[in-house]
Swiss-Prot record:
Annotated lipid attachment (S-palmitoyl cysteine): 4
Protein name (record): Guanine nucleotide-binding protein alpha-2 subunit
Biased composition (Low complexity): 52-66, 91-139
Gene: GPA2
Organism field: Kluyveromyces lactis (strain ATCC 8585 / CBS 2359 / DSM 70799 / NBRC 1267 / NRRL Y-1140 / WM37)
Subunit structure of this chain's protein: G proteins are composed of 3 units; alpha, beta and gamma. The alpha chain contains the guanine nucleotide binding site.
Function: Guanine nucleotide-binding proteins (G proteins) are involved as modulators or transducers in various transmembrane signaling systems. This protein may be involved in the determination of the cAMP level according to nutritional conditions, most probably as a regulator of adenylyl cyclase.
Top-level taxon of the source organism: Eukaryota
Amino acid sequence: MGLCASKDSRESTHDGGPRVNRPGANDANRRNDVRKGAGDKKQDKKNKKAKGSIVNAASNINNSSSGKTKISTVSEDGTVSNGVGNTAEYDNANNKNNGNNNNSNNNDNNNNNNNNIGNNINGNNNNDSENIHDSNNSNIENKRYFNNINTGVLNGVNGNSTNSDKALSNQFDQSNNSETHSGTMTGISQALALNDSGVNGFDTDLAKRNGTVNASGGQSPGGSETVNALKVLLLGSGESGKSTVLQQLKILHQNGFSREELLEYKPFIFDNIIETGKDLAKARRTFNVQLEEDAEISESDLDELLSQQYQPTKLPCLPADLAKTLKILWNLQSTQDLLVSEHRSSFYLMDSASYFYENLDRISEPKYIPTITDVIRTRKKTSGIFDTMIDLDKNLKLHFFDVGGQRSERKKWIHCFDNVTLIIFCVSLSEYDQTLLEDNSQNRLEESLILFDSVVNSRWFARSSVVLFLNKIDIFAEKLRHVPLEKYFPDYTGGKDINKAAKYILWRFVQLNRANLNIYPHVTQATDTSNIKLVFAAIKETILENSLKDSGVL
């Protein structure tokens, strides 16, 4: 179920990004293939074999011998859209067209999609249309770039008025029910689900091959099938969004957070806010930013902020005087100017800083209880290994292992490496201009590339599939306007085009796949529950497809 690119196409030249294949083909045929005779099944299996697949973001595509591809994409209303299309390759460095794969229809679509980003990572042959587009030709100004999801919850890149964080927070806080996203994702489950017999058959077969059902394939005394969990590793460098993904799955599949669990995050939220204030004060000193004459705080206030050793775990609430100082500091024009200055890449500030400071009045209230969105936005360093069992449905259980991403934590991963079915590797797209906290001489994105290289080419993962989350696309889109990607990666030539930039980074990771593992890339925003719901619906389809292939059905 993957966009299966040959090794030659993956290593070709690029215009701001890698070569990939355009999606096409009718997904309904895949469902019908299951019902074909034995002879047809064998022929289908031959036509669909491919190594080193790069699987399209929210859809899963396979090359056939004829150069066509199969795709099932999710449309805006939550249904699966089908179609047949030619395999497309990326343009080369001179933006030359590949005439064999271009036709007038493709050119029309490419012209319409020139500024589109959707849930599919695709390459177009038109020299002006290197982009990541969705199946509905959504415009980047009006639609979120990574999904075909209703804009009732999600904002456009250029600042639509809807506040998605507030909307999600209100929905979850009022109902604690992940299914009520103002109609968002309606029909996704139905669209992506097979009939009961297909799902049951798949899960039994997959579980048997992985030793996850009893030897006879029997059922538990209660009549339900005994299915253990498939092992899934959440890997990636520090602050790439691994733990946030796990939090979203808890919201979607474990009824969210109890009041007690929400309260456990208070000290971490307080710590995030206080440390952000200290980071800002340090940055102002480093770059000699003077306070305004009419500022309501003084340098001595900043001295006190930097010298105080706060213990968030012992704070029942955020002290009023501290909250006032932090709010004034954040709202200073000189501070806001610093955040968009040429110095921004030279100092650390957590991704959710603006979110917490915009909500500082609420958070500093004496009876403050964190919201779901507060929890998702919280930076909480993972130390050691944490495991969580997630039921994607009644017959598919995933055992997630979340491990620390900092260098000091990586040596602990070895204990999780046996019998791994799936690796979810998280990359923060927005970290291209940042350095490691533990080594300020090492670029974070380069570090992620090194780590990804060691993972995909490790003998431990020779039989594993890799899901690549290109995360924090929202922050990446905003940062790209002000911080040139080519400043840190000189071989990138796509300028401020977010489509080319995202594909370039994907290309850098794909080039490291010497072991020819199947790679399934997804453009994600881990803080967005609806986005993660869609992505994991696609991942469920990926597991299903792989199971059917392994069993010889496809």
